[in-house]
Design a protein with these regions (language model features):
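Clamp-loader machinery-focused feature within the broader ASCE/P-loop NTPase space
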Residues: 1-130, 136-139
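Acidic/polar active-site rim loop that often engages polyanionic ligands
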Residues: 79, 158-159
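Short, well-ordered alpha-helical microsegments
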Residues: 127, 157-158
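Short amphipathic alpha-helical segments
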Residues: 131-132, 159
Length: 167
């Protein structure tokens, strides 16, 4: 991992229980090397949602993730129009219409920020046909679109390829 970055955005500083994740994301922010997709893996309560929220704040905040501005508050309340939290709607996972809607939305310009963030929870519940449709979008998103995928295990995630997302 190297040395921890000295200028950690306030939104990421709250990830003190996950120093490797915090430092990795802070370094990417400071160096301007954000990936187009991230895969956060862990059991419920492991901090995936907190890390996804912190990263989204850094991406849409005009102050680089200060954690206290209106944009950051909107992300925290899940009301920011450019940060899309997507959860499985069906009893057995994502429904096809969710994936179609997401793919259609990706090409639209951001409303308030310079980029859009799509946070998909429990991606291991995607069915193969939905995962395949979404994979092309995740591998080749338009400029200014970042995906954060969350799963309990990488093995169960049909979307995961080492080329598609930074783990």
């Amino acid at each position: 991992m190297g040395n921890a970055p000295t200028d950690v955005p306030a939104a990421l500083a709250g990830l003190s229980d996950q120093p490797r994740v915090r430092d990795f994301l802070a370094r990417a922010m400071v160096e301007g090397r954000l990936s187009h997709a991230y895969l956060f893996v862990g059991a419920p309560g492991s901090g995936k949602h907190e890390a996804a929220e912190a990263l989204a704040k850094c991406i849409v905040c005009p102050n680089g993730g200060d954690g206290s501005c209106d944009e950051c508050r909107r992300v925290a309340h899940k009301t920011h129009p450019d940060v899309h939290w997507i959860f499985p709607e069906g009893a057995s996972g994502y429904v096809v219409e969710q994936v179609r809607s997401l793919i259609a939305d990706v090409s639209l310009a951001p409303v308030r920020a310079k980029a859009k963030v799509y946070i998909l929870d429990r991606v291991e519940t995607l069915r193969e046909s939905s995962a395949n449709a979404l994979l092309k979008t995740i591998e080749e998103p338009p400029d200014g679109v970042i995906f954060v995928l969350m799963a309990r295990t990488a093995d169960a995630c049909l979307l995961y390829t080492s080329d598609a997302a930074d783990e």
